[in-house]
Swiss-Prot record:
GO molecular function terms noted in the UniProt entry: zinc ion transmembrane transporter activity
Domain of life (superkingdom): Eukaryota
Recorded phenotype for the gene knockout or disruption: Conditional knockdown results in reduced growth rates in the presence of extracellular Zn(2+).
Annotated transmembrane regions: 473-493, 503-523, 540-560, 574-594, 738-758, 763-783
NCBIfam families reported for this sequence: CDF
Annotated keywords: Cytoplasmic vesicle, Ion transport, Membrane, Transmembrane, Transmembrane helix, Transport, Vacuole, Zinc, Zinc transport
GO cellular component, one term: vacuolar membrane
Location of this chain's protein in the cell: Vacuole membrane; Cytoplasmic vesicle membrane
Residue ranges of the region described as Disordered: 82-104, 205-227, 255-329, 621-707
Organism of origin: Toxoplasma gondii (strain ATCC 50853 / GT1)
Compositionally biased spans, kind Low complexity: 210-225, 255-266
Annotated family: Belongs to the cation diffusion facilitator (CDF) transporter (TC 2.A.4) family. SLC30A subfamily.
Protein name: Vacuolar zinc transporter TgZnT
Predominant location: membrane
Length: 896
């Protein structure tokens, strides 16, 4: 018998013993056949061909195999015996004892006597009958035990991982509860200390009414010694600050970096790194932990309010002889903990220092900072009181003026006055609201902004795409593992091939889920010098392995269904129906967990600086045609070559756009006015600007209808389907979804077939027919995943990107002569990359073209990983090598 038939017979060992499996080539007059004897053994029978009709064709063969199966159940090693019969002679047992045909001796082994009795009842013949029976241990018994061990180990690992995560979270939970229950003095160790002179001073300051609470009609308002007390307060606080000056480094004039929806901004210091909240700042590792109450607003904005219990502000000049347009800094202290903090206030539009006090802080000693234009020594008591009374109310989070072009910046700031209050002076320091603006510091990059935003999202309870995929796969794996064992038990009891095949399919699903989880973990590993792109394509390899596993198992099921079409067995339709119904419900739950929607591997969605808004207009780019840039003085060009977007004031060639207006509408009006003066504006086309009297080079396509993004030199239409709410779909999650969908359809078919068998038991052929149909359906459902995975591995153009339209858009940029060697591929799902050569007119416009092309690819086509090389007509020979010509064959070069 071929080895494949033998292996398959052991794989289907739950079949009835009389199920015929295969033949062995005849050897003379002897024929050998092998039969499955259940989960423990198989029986190979060798008999004489001459007695085939007289013995083996009768129904006694089934009885012989049934009796031999009982012997096989107790057999753990191979046993062979020969039964012979000659006329009226008795049958000799394998142990050498004789068994008379009329009856059985009490000492004879029951199994052997039963087999001998059936042989003795065979038709009397004159020749000798040789029947060799060999009981072999099941080949798959060891593999079945191994598979049980593997499944048990996986379940144990999953249980241990959940238990370990729960145990790791217990100390944090208990410590947080304990820290809330313990007094503040005991948290820091030691007994409660008596209040110092500093805290006594703060408590006295709390008793003094706020300058805003005074009314002009109060007769005693002018006689209260507020100014003198404020001076004494200032002197005391200066002494306290002098003692702690070593612990608070002075801030430099470096710009701070901020990220969308981040509650803290960072400012580089001369000695360390100071992390500043919108209203307070402290040096990491120096100041003790402050006690700040955080409360979540009930509105949609979800802005966190950070309130200090008691603060006392004292002025401190941190720039010394720096230019006057520097941010004012305050030393703030907590009356109960003597913690020193720093509060930064931004300059106003004129370059001066605004005098402001946080309205949400507790009433405290409010001292205005020293101003170069108005020395403090010249202020009298009335002037000081007037200045204190004129303190404006400061919002909890000031909006970033330059971030007005970013929709995420205006989230939570609906007050027009608040938007008009703040602008950036010459110092270029970011401040106020640190949520909703892209990084403006020279060392900040878009990647760091995205990483900080992902950290913020994790802290706020938001899940990233990978975390969401991992959670779904873990839940689906648990459901799949539990129900797989249910179907295995029910399939053995009901003798249903459809249930067993569905259980096998669930086993493949479980393996696919585990492979997908492993691929997700590997894809998060960062790149190294040997793997510069990282391990993103491990996700693709995992999806391919999962698809191949489905194909192999489906082929086995089709093979088994073919045999059941020939000889349908008896099936318990009732048990099969209820098990299939339960499986349908379980698969419905799994498909709900893994529910995804696909937009193709290249149809990634645009996001605003890691935020939840779509891309908004750029405002800080200058037109190269109207105002050529100087190559040596263009930080925007250097940033563009480094892969950055040039929309912040540090990168922008000019700061006029940053200061043009107080809100987004005013900024647009001012920009329109400048466009009218310089002759720009009017009607613009895709990929570049066009004058008022000039038509676009080609009309907008139908797919270009949607929101627009305009700048001084680039006008691109953003597709409406680039909605930030739709994240790109993970390929492993889609593969798992197809697994679960195939199981759901197969369970529905099994339920229908079981209902028919339950109604008409003689319709047992519906079981293999159902298996055959839905196995083929599962094969076809995997073709889409296979196609996209091969497209990524072969570095094909992503499905959602039109390379020809992209090349035309690049050609329409001002100063571009030719575009060749354009390559667009995907590192993994949702990670497209681009590389191309752009031939420009001259060196003067090279940097401008590079910047525009980078922004065009990143904003319209959502290709964030771009490599654009600018060439000149004189260097065209370097791009005419054999490798370049081979790559450019599939696409013709477009010329102006």
């Amino acid at each position: 018998m071929p080895f494949s038939c033998f292996v398959f017979s052991q794989f289907l060992r739950f079949l009835r013993p009389e199920f015929f499996l295969g033949d062995v080539s005849p050897q003379g007059s002897l024929i050998s056949r092998e039969f499955s004897l259940g989960p423990t053994a198989s029986l190979a029978v060798l008999w004489d061909e001459r007695f085939l009709d007289g013995f083996l064709s009768s129904a006694r063969l089934c009885l012989l195999l049934d009796d031999a199966r009982r012997l096989g159940r107790t057999s753990r090693r191979e046993k062979s015996f020969v039964l012979s019969s000659r006329g009226d002679e008795s049958v000799r047992s394998p142990q050498g004892r004789q068994v008379h045909s009329p009856g059985f001796a009490p000492a004879v082994d029951n199994e052997t006597a039963s087999v001998a009795s059936h042989i003795s009842r065979a038709p009397r013949v004159s020749s000798k009958l040789h029947c060799s029976c060999t009981l072999r241990p099941v080949f798959f018994s060891a593999l079945s035990r191994l598979s049980d061990f593997v499944v048990s180990s996986l379940l144990l690992c999953v249980s241990c991982s959940f238990a370990s995560s729960a145990l790791r979270s217990l100390p944090r939970v208990f410590s947080s509860r304990l820290s809330r229950a313990m007094p503040r003095s005991k948290k820091r160790g030691g007994a409660a200390k008596p209040p110092s002179a500093f805290s006594s001073l703060v408590s006295e300051m709390k008793e003094i009414p706020s300058p805003r609470s005074r009314s002009p009609s109060d007769p005693d308002s002018s006689s209260r010694p507020c100014a003198s007390f404020l001076r004494s307060c200032e002197e005391s606080l200066r002494e306290e600050a002098a003692t702690a000056a070593t612990t608070v480094p002075q801030l430099s004039a470096a710009s701070s970096s901020c990220c969308s929806r981040s509650n803290s901004s960072s400012m580089q210091t001369a000695e360390g790194r100071v992390v500043a909240s919108p209203d307070l700042a402290e040096e990491e590792g120096v100041s003790p932990s402050r006690r700040v109450h955080s409360s979540q607003k009930r509105g949609n904005a979800g802005v966190h309010e950070r309130r200090a219990e008691a603060t006392c502000c004292a002025p401190r000049d941190r720039h010394g002889g720096d230019r006057p347009a520097s941010s004012a800094s305050f030393l703030t202290c907590d009356g109960s903990s003597r913690e020193l903090r720093m509060q930064s206030l931004l300059p106003d539009a004129t370059g001066g220092r605004p005098v402001a006090a946080a309205a949400h802080l507790a009433p405290c000693c409010r001292v205005p900072p020293s101003d170069a234009s108005t020395p403090r020594s010249r202020l009298g008591q009335e002037g000081l009181e007037r200045e204190l009374a004129s303190f404006p109310e400061v919002d909890e989070h000031w909006p970033h003026r330059l971030a007005e072009t970013h929709s995420a910046c205006s989230r939570g700031h609906r007050n027009p006055r608040a938007v008009q209050r703040h602008s950036v002076g010459d110092c270029g320091l970011r401040g106020g609201d640190t949520r909703g603006c892209c990084s403006g510091a020279e060392k900040a990059r878009r990647e760091s902004c995205c990483e900080a935003d992902r950290t913020t999202e994790a802290g706020e309870g938001r899940e990233t795409g990978t975390q969401r995929a991992r959670r779904k796969l873990v839940m689906a794996s648990m459901v799949c593992c539990v129900f797989m064992f249910v179907e295995i038990v029910a399939g053995v009891l009901a003798n249903s091939l459809a249930l067993m095949t569905d259980a096998s399919h669930l086993l493949s699903d479980l393996c696919a889920f585990l492979i997908s989880l492993f691929a997700l973990w590997v894809s998060e590993l960062k790149g190294n010098p040997s793997m510069s792109f990282g391990y993103h394509r491990a996700e693709i390899l995992g999806a391919l392995l999962s698809v191949f596993l489905i194909w192999v198992l489906t082929a086995v099921l089709i093979y088994a269904a073919c045999f059941r079409l020939v000889d349908p067995p008896q099936v318990d339709g009732e048990l099969m129906f209820w098990t299939a119904l339960l499986g349908t419900l379980a698969n419905l739950f799994m498909t709900h967990i893994l529910k995804v929607h696909s937009h193709g591997i290249g149809q990634v969605h645009a996001h605003s600086c890691c935020g939840e808004e779509t891309f908004e207009p750029l405002r800080n780019l200058q037109a190269s045609s109207s105002s050529p840039e100087k190559p040596e003085e263009s930080p925007a060009s250097r940033a563009s070559q480094a892969g950055r977007l040039a929309w912040d004031p540090e990168v922008s060639p000019s700061g006029r756009d940053a200061e043009a207006g107080r809100d987004a509408e005013a900024g647009r009006d001012a920009e329109a006015g400048r466009d009218a003066e310089t002759g720009r504006g009017g009607e613009v086309g895709r990929g570049g600007e066009v004058g008022r009297d000039e038509k676009p080079r080609r009309p907008f396509s139908a797919s270009s209808a949607g929101s627009t993004a305009a700048s001084g030199d680039i006008y691109v239409r953003l597709e409406e389907d680039m909605d930030s709410e739709r994240n790109y779909e993970n390929m492993n999650l889609r593969a798992a979804y197809i697994h679960a969908l195939g199981d759901l359809l197969q369970n529905i078919g099994v339920m229908i077939a079981s209902a028919l068998i339950w109604w008409r038991p003689d319709w047992a052929i519906a079981d293999p027919i159902c298996t055959f149909i839905f196995s083929i359906f599962v094969l076809f459902t995997t073709l889409s995943i296979l196609k996209e995975a091969l497209n990524v591995l072969m570095e094909g153009t992503p499905v959602g990107i039109d390379a020809r339209a992209l090349q035309e858009d690049l050609l329409l940029l001002p100063g571009v002569v030719e575009v060749h060697d354009l390559h667009v591929w995907s590192l993994s799902v949702g990670k497209p990359s681009l590389a191309c050569h752009v031939v420009v007119e001259n060196e003067d416009v090279a940097r401008s073209v590079l910047r525009k092309a980078t922004v065009l690819c990143q904003r319209k086509y959502a290709i964030l990983h771009t490599t654009i090389q600018t060439d000149f007509s004189s260097d065209k020979r370097t791009c005419e090598t054999e490798a370049h010509q081979k790559c450019s064959d599939p696409m013709k070069v477009f010329r102006r």
